[in-house]
Amino acid sequence: MMISKKYTLWALNPLLLTMMAPAVAQQTDDETFVVSANRSNRTVAEMAQTTWVIENAELEQQIQGGKELKDALAQLIPGLDVSSRSRTNYGMNVRGRPLVVLVDGVRLNSSRTDSRQLDSIDPFNIDRIEVISGATSLYGGGSTGGLINIVTKKGQPETIMEFEAGTKSGFSSSKDHDERIAGAVSGGNEHISGRLSVAYQKFGGWFDGNGDATLLDNTQTGLQYSDRLDIMGTGTLNIDESRQLQLITQYYKSQGDDDYGLNLGKGFSAIRGTSTPFVSNGLNSDRIPGTERHLISLQYSDSAFLGQELVGQVYYRDESLRFYPFPTVNANKQVTAFSSSQQDTDQYGMKLTLNSKPMDGWQITWGLDADHERFTSNQMFFDLAQASASGGLNNKKIYTTGRYPSYDITNLAAFLQSGYDINNLFTLNGGVRYQYTENKIDDFIGYAQQRQIAAGKATSADAIPGGSVDYDNFLFNAGLLMHITERQQAWLNFSQGVELPDPGKYYGRGIYGAAVNGHLPLTKSVNVSDSKLEGVKVDSYELGWRFTGNNLRTQIAAYYSISDKSVVANKDLTISVVDDKRRIYGVEGAVDYLIPDTDWSTGVNFNVLKTESKVNGTWQKYDVKTASPSKATAYIGWAPDPWSLRVQSTTSFDVSDAQGYKVDGYTTVDLLGSYQLPVGTLSFSIENLFDRDYTTVWGQRAPLYYSPGYGPASLYDYKGRGRTFGLNYSVLF
């Protein structure tokens, strides 16, 4: 394996540390890794902000050890919350606030706040992951907590073939097994190269630490009994020494396997609390939950464009998100409808970035961004009698209605970023981004009224008028970087991010009168023109320090973020931007140590934080449905050639709020290992080594959202997986 000469700050795994030890001493201190996510070709050592780079070797160690992508990232990224262990990454914040996820610079976040950005790519196709902690406006709104940029594998000039196959099981049942297989071929020459890959994974049943089947998540949808397919192609054309074209295409599909579902008991008795929900076969549904995406991106770069470095990108992506069938329940705990939503997004856009150095010590980055998004949705209703008799397994469509108003969003933005070396010790950074947003909302018949029409209880209804509304945001950042030594930096940073409101959540609401000759008249509705949305700004401050030595590498930052507004949908069908002060403060960091002259290494990473809101002039603990718990991970590794062994732990700590609600913490321990064969590598793992029985963070939050209105808390008690054994073989030739 070739060792990169680029010097980076990461949470090193023991195998990588051992491999790197001889090379590190030979590297010069300025051989640092260029982070593409910052759009300014700055290295980690030049960043006045907490920055992490997860290299391929350490990610592979987790994935080939059986970890899901969300689990691996939570283990390796200090500021990222623990995994939901579900299809969703809902509630997985960075530093307690939402994050933006990109694939090769293309945003996966949409205006709707559906959280499946990490259900978007098979890890087999990932080269590295770049993380910027704290608020940033580099890629538009939404990244008030941080940014994760997934950089995909690209073709190489020489012919390379990759193959990987693995399985894992807890041996609790004949259904308790997952399998994965993946292959890729890449090649070319110095002028043109490409890579084509196919990765497939099949998930079976999951069982908790007591050997009981874990419940399927019928709120955000789970991964049990599902399949995942990721087909990706990349191509690179080197036009000449300075110009390059790069093409990326992807088809991704992850959905249930059409057979297993959540049995809610005959007559939906589990919702009334008179029976226990369980997972069973026999699912026969006209809508299967899952995620389907297409992505295509074309990037042009020119390192000698009028004395500047130019990067231009155009892209298109679409996604279809389908959710698990869910009941509508009245005040008497009777199920009045059983339905499933589908939400579709089409987005295209462009990015233009130019980097220049007008004089020694002065760097300027500027550019333009533009994108357009179209959102549509529908709700499929099933025959209630059949669904009830089968416990929610036999779901035959009877009609489909709209779910939210359709809308178009256009964003236009310009940004300017500058860095100036005051002297050999200090670098001053600063920048501004201006973003203009226009929302166009379609006319929309109320959701309940559409149901009445579809059920034959009415013949027509007035439409809630749509309309157009726009708003803009100026976002600023400034930082001072101190170069203490060539291997040590400290920084003070201020940056702003913005939370863009979800139009589907606020518009399309109205009050209707009684039917007149079958027609439902609209008496009052949200007026789009008079209900202007606006972004909610977050101010983020941090003081940080990093050291990158031969054996010791560490990065630590104290941070504080505050927002003072939120968007509220009022009962009188108006929308208000109200005072709502929320602050989050904490410390994020990582320490990795390679014990000299041994095969041993050890390390920890952590994010200790507190979230508070201001109520009647007093700061109080924030709602546990949103507040992130503190987290810590640790590992110890031993890597005598050709072995590599790692024991690691992940701890999510207790968090409580002013109302007395609490999310309990837990600790899990994993054993990961590998053995280098004459051809290929055999990896093995034991996840949840001590078979801990626990409820995930999402499993503790979900009852606060859905119970008792949609059934007892036990219906939403999503457990973590018990002890699970994994075996994987990979080869590169």
UniProtKB/Swiss-Prot annotation:
Q: Where is this motif: TonB box?
A: 31-38
Q: How does it sit in the membrane?
A: Multi-pass membrane protein
Q: Does this entry carry the keyword tRNA processing?
A: no
Q: Name the Gene3D superfamilies for this protein.
A: TonB-dependent receptor, beta-barrel domain (2.40.170.20), TonB-dependent receptor, plug domain (2.170.130.10)
PROSITE patterns referenced in this protein's UniProt entry, alphabetically: TONB_DEPENDENT_REC_1, TONB_DEPENDENT_REC_2, TONB_DEPENDENT_REC_3
TBDR beta-barrel domain: from which residue to which, for each copy? 158-733
Q: Which InterPro entries match?
A: Plug_dom, Plug_dom_sf, TonB-dep_rcpt-like, TonB-dep_rcpt_b-brl, TonB_box_CS, TonB_rcpt_b-brl_sf, TonB_rcpt_CS, TonB_sidphr_rcpt
For the motif TonB C-terminal box, give the residue ranges: 716-733
Localization per Swiss-Prot or TrEMBL: Cell outer membrane
Give every TBDR plug domain span: 43-153
Q: What Pfam families has UniProt attached to this entry?
A: Plug, TonB_dep_Rec_b-barrel
**Keywords per UniProt:** Cell outer membrane, Ion transport, Iron, Iron transport, Membrane, Plasmid, Receptor, Signal, TonB box, Transmembrane, Transmembrane beta strand, Transport
What do the Gene Ontology cellular component annotations say?
A: cell outer membrane
| Signal sequence residues | 1-25
- Chief place of localization: membrane
The job of this chain, per UniProt, is described as:
Receptor for aerobactin.
Looking up PANTHER family in the UniProt record yields:
FERRIC AEROBACTIN RECEPTOR (PTHR30069:SF42), TONB-DEPENDENT OUTER MEMBRANE RECEPTOR (PTHR30069)
**Name assigned to this protein:** Ferric aerobactin receptor
| Species, as recorded | Klebsiella pneumoniae
Q: Tell me the lineage of the source organism.
A: Bacteria, Pseudomonadati, Pseudomonadota, Gammaproteobacteria, Enterobacterales
